[in-house]
Amino acid sequence: MSSAVVTAGLTRRFGRRTAVDHLDLDIAGGEVFGLVGPNGAGKTTLIRILCAILRPSAGSARVLGLDVATDAARLRPLIGYMSQAFSLYQALTVTENLRFYGTLYGGVPARREQDVCRLVGLTADELARKVAELPTGVRQRAALAAAVLHGPQLIFLDEPTSGVDPAGRRDFWALIRELSADGTTVIVTTHVMAEAERCDRVALMAEGRVLACGPPASLRAATGTIVAVIEADPWQRAYAELAARWPGTTLRGTTIRVSLPAGADPRSLLAESLSTVRVERIHVTDPSFEDAFIWFIRHSHPVMEPP
């Protein structure tokens, strides 16, 4: 499928701070593409550039074949954008919000509005209530309805499940997959690693740069590591000794996680570091997506897989 988004050397600076740093991305049409990283990684700034809200400081970005710097007016009717704040008018009902957004796109047929409300699961009661009166999960679905009301070819979702409970998060991702199945390209930002694994491909971002890009399973495999989960007594000493030798060792409660080269015998490899403690359990597992993200941050080896 042809590319929905292509960037080359894309950069955005705010004074002396570089929020987006020479990004090269190629996102295929119809993909569910994740931008993953901690707060301050540059995800929201990148989305706002691709939506033609911010202009690049350098480099270029083409969205649906249009240059974001010179073709913003032609681009905006073709895309949808759901911000972290949900961008709804609190004093208006959901229906009034949808009608308002519909007018921005030259009017939306009543049938289309009904179909969208049905897609996101908005009830008649919810549609009639003011946004300020609604729980977060319903506001989230109303914001998605407003973003897709005009039938965009590409939709940007900026941390759409922030503050939403696990059930609401699961249902929302089912909606994302429905949109993708109909051919809509979805670009979503998140710092929740479990959500990132639902994407077709993800770009791992930190400090405005892309550290790696590819399918989640490929990125986990690209680390070339296994994870040893260790319980030892005394655990404080075990953690201190392992962390000194194996950077990236983490502690969760009293359980220690350490990344080792794939194919290694963890007991032999860790024997020296654990010689002064009693090892109660060593369990070896594949790296989680969170483990992979931490590994890429520490090693900063770019891995870029095409769409």
List the model feature ranges, each with a label.
Residues 91, 130-137:
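Conserved ABC ATPase signature
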Residues 213-214:
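ABC ATPase "signature
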Residues 225-300:
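Short, charged/small-residue-rich alpha-helical element at the C-terminal edge
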